[in-house]
Amino acid sequence: MERNVLTTFSQEMSQLILNEMPKAEYSSLFNDFVESEFFLIDGDSLLITCICEISFKPGQNLHFFYLVERYLVDLISKGGQFTIVFFKDAEYAYFNFPELLSLRTALILHLQKNTTIDVRTTFSRCLSKEWGSFLEESYPYFLIVADEGLNDLQTQLFNFLIIHSWARKVNVVLSSGQESDVLCLYAYLLPSMYRHQIFSWKNKQNIKDAYTTLLNQLERFKLSALAPLFGSLKWNNITEEAHKTVSLLTQVWPEGSDIRRVFCVTSCSLSLRMYHRFLGNREPSSGQETEIQQVNSNCLTLQEMEDLCKLHCLTVVFLLHLPLSQRACARVITSHWAEDMKPLLQMKKWCEYFILRNIHTFEFWNLNLIHLSDLNDELLLKNIAFYYENENVKGLHLNLGDTIMKDYEYLWNTVSKLVRDFEVGQPFPLRTTKVCFLEKKPSPIKDSSNEMVPNLGFIPTSSFVVDKFAGDILKDLPFLKSDDPIVTSLVKQKEFDELVHWHSHKPLSDDYDRSRCQFDEKSRDPRVLRSVQKYHVFQRFYGNSLETVSSKIIVTQTIKSKKDFSGPKSKKAHETKAEIIARENKKRLFAREEQKEEQKWNALSFSIEEQLKENLHSGIKSLEDFLKSCKSSCVKLQVEMVGLTACLKAWKEHCRSEEGKTTKDLSIAVQVMKRIHSLMEKYSELLQEDDRQLIARCLKYLGFDELASSLHPAQDAENDVKVKKRNKYSVGIGPARFQLQYMGHYLIRDERKDPDPRVQDFIPDTWQRELLDVVDKNESAVIVAPTSSGKTYASYYCMEKVLKESDDGVVVYVAPTKALVNQVAATVQNRFTKNLPSGEVLCGVFTREYRHDALNCQVLITVPACFEILLLAPHRQNWVKKIRYVIFDEVHCLGGEIGAEIWEHLLVMIRCPFLALSATISNPEHLTEWLQSVKWYWKQEDKIIENNTASKRHVGRQAGFPKDYLQVKQSYKVRLVLYGERYNDLEKHVCSIKHGDIHFDHFHPCAALTTDHIERYGFPPDLTLSPRESIQLYDAMFQIWKSWPRAQELCPENFIHFNNKLVIKKMDARKYEESLKAELTSWIKNGNVEQARMVLQNLSPEADLSPENMITMFPLLVEKLRKMEKLPALFFLFKLGAVENAAESVSTFLKKKQETKRPPKADKEAHVMANKLRKVKKSIEKQKIIDEKSQKKTRNVDQSLIHEAEHDNLVKCLEKNLEIPQDCTYADQKAVDTETLQKVFGRVKFERKGEELKALAERGIGYHHSAMSFKEKQLVEILFRKGYLRVVTATGTLALGVNMPCKSVVFAQNSVYLDALNYRQMSGRAGRRGQDLMGDVYFFDIPFPKIGKLIKSNVPELRGHFPLSITLVLRLMLLASKGDDPEDAKAKVLSVLKHSLLSFKQPRVMDMLKLYFLFSLQFLVKEGYLDQEGNPMGFAGLVSHLHYHEPSNLVFVSFLVNGLFHDLCQPTRKGSKHFSQDVMEKLVLVLAHLFGRRYFPPKFQDAHFEFYQSKVFLDDLPEDFSDALDEYNMKIMEDFTTFLRIVSKLADMNQEYQLPLSKIKFTGKECEDSQLVSHLMSCKEGRVAISPFVCLSGNFDDDLLRLETPNHVTLGTIGVNRSQAPVLLSQKFDNRGRKMSLNAYALDFYKHGSLIGLVQDNRMNEGDAYYLLKDFALTIKSISVSLRELCENEDDNVVLAFEQLSTTFWEKLNKV
């Protein structure tokens, strides 16, 4: 019964998990460094993953520990902060595997004793209360767990852990299918969803019962495993025996010893005693002789057990004396242990486990635990056993060597002492019995010499690039001779048999030509011209929505001497007459303007004063609106004084009222003080005596007597009655505290008053002027400043400068996303106007989807990949030379996951100066230093060009560069400009649900910190406090430690920068904040940690996360924010479906609200009116026909007018009936006029989600994510910026620079993508400069620990990716060989090769990259893409054109060259140009394997789901294609293995011989005095490129040729592994050897054409699926165009088949 319950429920759990697997996100786990996401690793999952690793052989302990440590070090190097958890119950799963019990125990001890990793072993099970509490306290972001165990029962244990983690809102990361590169670890993430929590709540009892049943079953395993070996001995008896053995050893070896010796002698002695007892229990009677005899054929004698123990002791002595370098050369014995040996070995493993379980209890004993990782080496044991039973008996007698022999005798004699119960044999001979321990095999020793090892050596190549880049290492490399078969068999440039009519060498059109031209730039067609005009009009309209800057007309200027704007200008000694007249005129004009403004104020003053009396707040708004438009200081002073008088009056009235007597509304007092601030700061010089008296009186009324006295000292002392009377108006707190606590967001910022003639729209800050100076001096700069701080202005100034200099200079703006490209293009077109020569335009765009005016514009806006295409295009160099400046926006993408290396290429290829902008870089100094080194390189190159130019001029020849290129003298300096101050403060709030309503609790930034964090890292540099939060911090410090020495000094009223200060400024508040932070830090450093901890705890909010599904409360959250006047807001979620669903849920909420308000008969009336309207329309149409035929015009005109009037009336009534009430929409109807609204809606009429977005927009709602078309995104962006939309849900697409400022930002979904970087980018949108004085950030359904980590985590450091690929090398050689300007081309190529960020200041990495470059050349030459001089040939153009898809591009061309596509693409009948559906489907199958690779987790294969439309799992490649792919992969791996063997010389062998994490070394002097050691360790060949630890499992270099070999078998310090080999796996396996199937989404869609089918069966998100299919369709189209260009035969079957497929696929895609 129990088993049935367990089976049924476990199947239900398993199905739930399997159902989630295809939806798993395969993504990078780490983006943060320093206190990043805290996560957990299930220790048993880690153990299972490593022992099931393909390269690992059971019993090789040291290799196992190396795998564990290498994995953990990889996590740590990527910023991982984790704890490893071993549950006590998990041990039950190993009772059938005693060898793993001891390995697990050793692993736990090793991690605890020899590393700093936090290891937890106290939790009994995942269902325990302690575990639940731990999860609540630490809130790990995810748990790494295995999806499959060693057997079904262990798999069920893992399933319980997964289900429980989900129930606790902890995400799960699968240990299978993980891949790692230089910066990222990619894994399958299964997020915790509400449905998982529901499942756990519903099945709470079932889960408990099933878990108990499972444990009972595992407990029975323990008994059944022990009984046959230990008989009646119980668990506790054996434990006691083990304890006694160790205790006895402490007496024998009181001085202590090494764990390997201790483990050896104790486990051997316990094994012998247990086996002795085991044999005794088998004796038929007690009266027999004491000599033990074999009871039956399955039971070996005690002597055989002794022999095994002797061999084990000798093995351990080998471990003690042989360094890893020698052990890594051990012979590989392939024989297995004989069947009769199994009981002995099982018992020995159990004894080892019991010894290890007890060893840590002897902590007082001097036991060295360093070598816990090296207790067993089964391969070495087999080697020794093989020698003694196969070689020694045949007459091969080899000495052990004195040292080894002595140590062995010492160990065996100790075993003898520990046994005591009976006599054991002498140390020698080692074998006294003749039973074979190993099975007999024909070839028991693996012969590596028979394995195929590629011929070491490079093909000779001669090229300028090769010599310049890798020339210094060529002399040390082995090269093949010219008569070597590899060289003589090189593919010559010839026409391939299958491709007779193909011109493979013909230059292809590049990506620029391919990308869709939005309109023909040279066309004179009126329709085209009209579409161009419409486009430019819309762009200006779009640009106008981005900013309210008037367009500037640019006029090209002649080059003048530069002015220095930073210093003061010297006055002239004498003014000319003209200057005097001009000055007088200006004065007169100013006086006239002032008079007008005074008249205007006189006209408005009465109404504003009345408004101030009726409603102070609306009156203040009108007053401030007037102040914004007024320029006269005198008039402004009058207005401010009126405002101050009104505010004081309102305050006095309020204090006298009943309400004011109980609780005072301090917002009125804030308005009083705000007016005083304004008067004192801006108009201090204009104030009269009466004005000062009024201000002083106001201060007295507020209770700030000291401030009043300092401003206007009282002449007469006031009597007590007056003082008492005035006390009732006092705010009750000191002026400093009042200003900080209640006026923080109003505090005046220190801004410069002096305008800069270079900028008209605003007065730039000092740091912004520094940027302008950079541009003026033609310098480069890295600019790091917060979001919305104004760093982009430097970009537009840079553009303006280039536009003014000439008509042909170009500035390139590189943006990371298409959304940002569209936005910047619109801004440029709105900002600047310029009359240019015919054919030239001001602004152009180039993205992969479309382009316009890209090469005939002066400002090009593009994405990195497209700019790289232009820089690497051999025939675009003349255009590239026109570039004067490049602006890189969001340059931190250099450290991203996808396309990061492209940013590197661009930064090193450009010769001109650049601006690199970012809000989030934590190591800008390192980045700047690297970029400066690149600029020094270009300085040298430019000098060479100048010298060449001079010599060419001397001989009368033209220079290669435009004349003005060298005239505009650029600087090679790279400046770093840092600015850390946000204009607006951000305050954070946590949302919680109480009694069905949403509550907000303020989250103080210090609540995110711990004393440990402050001690280790200090306060994060960008963790700032608002003035109110500074006061809260002081109050908390004072409350916790009232007698703290500096309490009075840091009291707000006494603080040095506030003391008796009337106007406290923002900078003063910042100084106070810094003082408090420094004081709290000193508390921690001076031993007052507990007080500091209590302060931080005191600042934490009390709100708890609600257990319910908070996303269902999302509409309520939005409604609450509206009531609090916190809209417009951006709501960030991280799944496309969630973004759309959240927006839809808010719309549904408003619709339901409207329905409850609609009168009962409203729908019926609307229906009646709609019917009437239809009839009237018909009547009007009929009347028109009658009018055309009839002669009686007058009567007909009257009839028409009546119909039209009725029509208009009905339309108005119907509109009124259907009108959305104001409280049922979030749209601000006043923000946008109807015409603008219709224009925006009109653009999305034919878009996929157009109608849906329009319906949402009418309610003031929108959504924004990557799968939307750019027109759909523009609708949301424009209407949000104009204020019409006030609720927008979005993914991280808005984080990268898109200009959508708002009042509030809400994080409404936890995700792996919500990291420190994205948090800063997204939260930076809150608080619109000039509109909001403060920004608000809300956390909705984000756990407290996660919030803390987001606030305190540093942003990622920028670190270099692996910079090279085979296709990049081909593209570089193509540029060097075919470039229009060979010198410039070669300089660019060398810059890319020499200046990767990865190799900066890393000479060893540079040497490795040089070798990788040579490996790439070797492959390209062999495959016929390059000749031996480095010139492109064959299908080099097609391969480089498909560079996005390496290695699929290389495989595709090899299929083409081998004629496989010609064999496949056979038409339905001879002479036909049409291909059958079967041919098309096979073609899609092949292309899906190449360009549509999306893997399922391996465990999903076990699922038994019914699929309705899709096949889901992609079939294998057709046999001929599969064979060709295997051949291609073998060629690649042969070359790559050669490369790895050569590059292994660069390895740091000191590091290679130590464990990566614990740094335990296995080095030492090799043993040379032992003949046996020399004999056993004789396998030195073929073990050069792989780690010596990996060699312990019998691996060789030739294993690298096998595609299933894991990436990390290679040497760790060479900086490259097998993932850099461009192989394309026909079948992919995880590290345990399980097959990972491909998702057949592309082929399934081609068959059924349904996105819904992909959502239901293929488990894809609709938006993701559409995006992937579009990408697939673009690739097919690109290939189709390339093939058409390369083939001169119009009727070639392959070309026709691809054209048919492209057309059909696009037709299907356009229908969805």
UniProtKB/Swiss-Prot annotation:
SMART domains hit by this protein: DEXDc, HELICc
Induction / repression: By interferon (IFN). Up-regulated during vesicular stomatitis virus (VSV), or poliovirus (PV) infection.
Function (record text): Positively regulates RIGI- and IFIH1/MDA5-dependent type I interferon and interferon inducible gene expression in response to viral infection. Binds ssRNA, dsRNA and dsDNA and can promote the binding of RIGI to dsRNA. Exhibits antiviral activity against hepatitis C virus and vesicular stomatitis virus (VSV).
Top-level EC class as recorded in UniProt: hydrolase
Name of the encoding gene: DDX60
GO biological processes: defense response to virus; innate immune response; positive regulation of MDA-5 signaling pathway; positive regulation of RIG-I signaling pathway; response to virus
Annotated organism of origin: Homo sapiens (Human)
Any one GO MF annotation of this record: single-stranded RNA binding
E.C. no: 3.6.4.13
Example of a GO cellular component annotation carried by this entry: intermediate filament cytoskeleton
Reactions accelerated catalytically: ATP + H2O = ADP + phosphate + H(+)
A Pfam family hit: PIN-like_DDX60
Binding sites annotated in the UniProt record for ATP: 785-792
Subunit structure: Interacts with EXOSC1, EXOSC4, RIGI, IFIH1/MDA5 and DHX58/LGP2.
Residues in Helicase ATP-binding domain copies: 772-939
UniProt keyword annotations, A-Z: Antiviral defense, ATP-binding, Cytoplasm, Helicase, Hydrolase, Immunity, Innate immunity, Nucleotide-binding, RNA-binding
Segments carrying motif DEVH box: 889-892
Helicase C-terminal domain ranges (all copies): 1226-1370
Domain of life of the organism encoding this protein: Eukaryota
Localization, UniProt: Cytoplasm
Tissue: Brain, lymph node, prostate, stomach, thyroid, tongue, trachea, uterus, skeletal muscle, spleen, kidney, liver and small intestine.
Name of the protein this chain belongs to: Probable ATP-dependent RNA helicase DDX60
InterPro entries: DEAD/DEAH_box_helicase_dom, Helicase_ATP-bd, Helicase_C-like, P-loop_NTPase, PIN-like_DDX60, SKI2_subfamily_helicases
